[in-house]
Amino acid sequence: FFVFLFIGVFSLNSAQASFVPEVRPGPGVTAQKWLSDYHPPLKGTNFDTPIFFLDGAKNGATALLIGGTHPREIGPYTAAVVAIENAAVKEGRLIVIPALNASGYGISDLSTKIPRVHEIKGRSGARSLYYGDRRIALADWGKPDDKKFIHMSGFEIDDPEEARNINRNYPGRADGSWAEQVTFAVMELI
């Protein structure tokens, strides 16, 4: 886990590196995978992100907690990190993705002047909470935005930037845009 934390700190200092959330997995974490384990084309990109599994001693229902779909909404990211570090599942399984839109954490929110990094002190020591843009970074997207966003269902939104909004792209496509590939991977996980 120490290597994982080092990579997370390093990623903020390198424009080319992917964002990896600063997480200190608690004793309830039974496994860790990556989103690319469910859709291999994401491996090595700024769209790959860690997934944590917390399994109970007894079989039961499975719950999925996703944080960081919109990196400028700090609450879900914080809730996901708190769950990974503190939850203990007795029955069933909890799957946690703390920072689904890893690309969005790599850039400042384009509509506010809120700092990207918020330093806090807690019981486990000093750490950082991150804040980014709600959309995939244009540099990661790899092309200019189209004139409008057209969902795979045919629904149209006049704001072209919505194509880079992960939440608008479910259920995703294996061969679609980056946002569609991220949501496809989540659906494969489910």
What are these regions (language model features)?
Residues 74-79, 90-190:
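Active-site/substrate-binding loop(s) of hydrolase catalytic cores
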Residues 8-49:
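Short glycine- and acidic-rich boundary segments immediately preceding or forming the N-terminal edge
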Residues 80-85:
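Histidine-anchored nucleotide/phosphate-binding helix
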Residues 61-64, 94:
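Alpha/beta-hydrolase fold active-site loops
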Residues 64-72:
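Histidine-centered catalytic micro-motifs
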Residues 2-8:
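Sec-dependent N-terminal signal peptides
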Residues 50-59:
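Short beta-strand-to-loop junctions in surface cap/lid or active-site-entrance loops
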Residues 60, 72-75:
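Short N-terminal binding/cap micro-motifs at the start of the first secondary-structure element
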